[in-house]
UniProtKB/Swiss-Prot annotation:
Keywords: Cytoplasm, DNA-binding, Methylation, Nucleus, Repeat, RNA-binding, Transcription, Transcription regulation. Residues 1-21, 192-224 are annotated as: Disordered. It is found in: Nucleus; Cytoplasm. Residues 26-108, 111-190 form the RRM domain. It comes from Xenopus tropicalis. CDD domains: RRM1_hnRPDL, RRM2_hnRPDL. Acts as a transcriptional regulator. Binds DNA and RNA. Pfam families: RRM_1. This is Heterogeneous nuclear ribonucleoprotein D-like. GO terms for cellular component: cytoplasm; nucleus.
Length: 297
């Protein structure tokens, strides 16, 4: 039986996300899922092949409905072999398509993270103190709004190694200063551009909606500016602090499926993400506009 209990002591998908861009022999991509299949259903089915330590099903950010695919992490790699040895897998009346999760080739282990939902009132010293508890920090970037010359509601933290990033990603949200912040791996802008080029060939993604009223109070202002920044460049950052993945084209969360026809499952919903085009990193080394912009994914 699985060790994946009803109330796990980690966030769903956190153990899967902790090793993004790295080959993990116990990790699988599961395609062709019925919209009615739940995480529990998928976990129970795959548990017959070995102990499942993490499982996540991706959902549409607008409707909350399953997008028909997910990821699973087995405790032992031999379980993956057992799954693949079985010619046919049927769950909730549908043939499902399990595959090894293949990490994108040529990508270095992540050392830089994006911190979203950060109050501009949080001092640099507070940021150093919190993130320094996970490992040695190489650099902290605090983007400024070029129009107001005020801090934006997010920052970037670069470590000297990859281990601190793994530790951070074990939890999706972190309490930093007075707010609850979301942590994501920062991705080079050129990678995002490549994804956008692929997306344009397959059609446009979800429409960009505009957020609520334009409040000017400092308490709401920074948070709203952060949400607007996401709406325009990255995706939807809900009022409840949750971020919903927007979609992917031939690659997902650091995994390469370029030879796989996701269109048959209706997965190709496009990427929308943060590009950093409006920000200058006053704290970045060298000053001025930061040439190697990053965005989370």
């Amino acid at each position: 039986m699985t060790g994946f209990g009803a109330t796990p002591d980690f966030n769903e998908g956190s153990k899967i996300n902790a090793s993004k861009n790295q080959q993990d022999e116990g990790k699988m991509f599961i395609g062709g899922l019925s919209w009615d299949t739940s995480k529990k259903d998928l976990t129970e089915y795959l548990s017959r092949f070995g102990e499942v330590v993490d499982c996540t099903i991706k959902t549409d950010p607008v409707t909350g409905r399953s997008r028909g695919f997910g990821f699973v992490l087995f405790k032992d790699a031999v379980s993956v072999d057992k799954v693949l040895e079985t010619k046919e897998h049927k769950l909730d009346g549908k043939l499902i398509d399990p595959k090894r999760a293949k990490a994108l080739k040529g990508k270095e282990p992540p050392k830089k993270v994006f911190v979203g939902g950060l109050s501009p009132e949080t001092t640099e010293e507070q940021i150093k103190q919190y993130f320094g508890g996970f490992g040695e920090i190489e650099n902290i970037e605090l983007p400024m709004d070029t129009k107001t010359n005020e801090r934006r509601g997010f920052c970037f933290v670069t470590y000297t190694g990859e281990e601190p990033v793994k530790k951070l990603l074990e939890s999706r949200f972190h309490q930093i200063g007075t707010g609850k912040c979301e942590i994501k791996v920062a991705q080079p802008k050129e990678v995002y551009r490549q994804q956008q080029q692929k997306q344009q060939k397959g059609g446009r993604g979800a429409a960009t909606g505009r957020g609520g009223a334009r409040g000017r109070g400092r308490g709401q202002g920074w948070n709203q500016g952060y949400s607007n920044y996401y709406d325009q460049n990255y995706g939807s950052y809900g009022n409840n602090g949750s971020y919903a993945d927007q979609g992917y084209n031939n690659s997902y969360s650091g995994y390469d499926y370029s030879g796989y026809n996701y269109g048959s499952y209706g997965y190709n919903q496009g990427y929308t993400d943060y590009s950093g085009q409006q920000s200058t990193y006053g704290k970045a080394r060298g000053g001025g506009n930061h040439q190697n912009n990053y965005q989370p994914y």
